[in-house]
Amino acid sequence: MAPRNLINLENVSLSYGKGAVLDQVSLGLAEGARIGIVGRNGAGKSTLMKIIAGVEDPDEGRVTKSNSARIGILSQIDSAAPQSTVGDVVLGNREKHDWASDPRIREIFTGLFGSFDDHIFERTFASLSGGEKRRVGLAKLLIDDLDLILLDEPTNHLDVEGVAWLASHLK
């Protein structure tokens, strides 16, 4: 059985002011695909991901998404309400008995934070370092049941152990 097509971009263009950031970009993303977008700073990689995620609309062209495709994006800016706890950001309204016994969630937290202790879930977003904020964003995406995960500079602020864990987890 062929992989399910998740999203298509056809002749997508976007400009900011007088400068074209994307010019007639066409691509398709299928379930199970792993791709990298490379280019120099300011070349439009982040903008392309925002269009794929539906966060930004192109000036021209068409974006077609599978109706059931669940898409998440980790942008370059790690943001959450400063008073939100790690548990609020990552787990949302899930009941503790639902997530605490889930081996996948335990593995993600242990891999990204080194443990699965309650104190991690109680820390506020404002109290976290840059690397910890990045780990929170990654944990949220990896725990959510998504079909497509877009990672924009995912290793920014991560230490060597975090980069190694993420690389092995995404295989």
What are these regions (language model features)?
Residues M1-K171:
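ABC ATP-binding cassette signature C-motif
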